[in-house]
Amino acid sequence: DTVWSIDYLNCIKEMENFYFSKKIQNILMVVNKDLSFDKKLKGDFNLKKNLLSKGDENQSIYTGCQILNKNLLKNINKKIFSINEIWNALVKKNNLFGFESVNKFSHVTDLEIYNKLLKSY
């Protein structure tokens, strides 16, 4: 889980403004993996001009913050599904948007990282 701080507030507001001003259907907040406290975390996406893609060497980590238009969910006929299904379909259409945070990224990946995070705060 992501450790959220007040530092993210402006970034979330900027992401929200981008979402509405560009009239897009989705946006995910990502951070460059170099800003991750846990250096073992691998990237989820690549970000270029606010578009997300996937490759062999992904440089951006999904933070856990996203805005999705409910219309993206209307064709899902399962009670339980992975949001990755929607993301992957949008990536294939070159239509998954990203917003880059420049905040340091702390994610409680496991007990070891949790204990290291405790010592750093």
Task: Describe every region a protein language model picked out.
Residues V3-L9, K13-E16, F20-S21, K33-F37, ...:
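Catalytic-core segments of class I nucleotidyltransferases/pyrophosphorylases
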